[in-house]
């Protein structure tokens, strides 16, 4: 599953890829600063693949060319765009429409983010066992590596709360423990 969203659509593509990675093993978020770089990342796309292209006015020509390339390679093309008349739909077999008529110099991502969120939730419901297994595994990893739990700053007293206290080592204890090993622990070790 390839996902492409360029310029103001990049955060949408990133959000979609983040959650798709929890559900699927084969997600590739396309990063690009040039058209050729985009095609290099897609060189192996084929009939068993899908690409999701996200683009809104003013439509990205690089996204459109990526969808054309995928279509020419017989990949399934899905678009998330603002209208059935969007040029992004030229190569698409499935169009997810997120109309946003907001007249502003700032692109509103509310409507497309809602469509993406609904897509993620629908797929999670379809793949409940796989997603539950992945989330259980991630919870264990997050707990082990203290990703979320009790590692916030307490803004009242500016102290860091950690579930596991920092371990301080005495330099002599480390030297004694590793005297016969060829392990370099360097000056970055927390020692007193």
Task: Report the location of each language-model feature.
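Generic alpha-helical secondary structure signal
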Residues: 36, 61, 129-136, 172
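Internal, active-site/partner-interface "lid" segment
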Residues: 127-160
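Ala/Thr-enriched low-complexity intrinsically disordered regions
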Residues: 166, 176-179
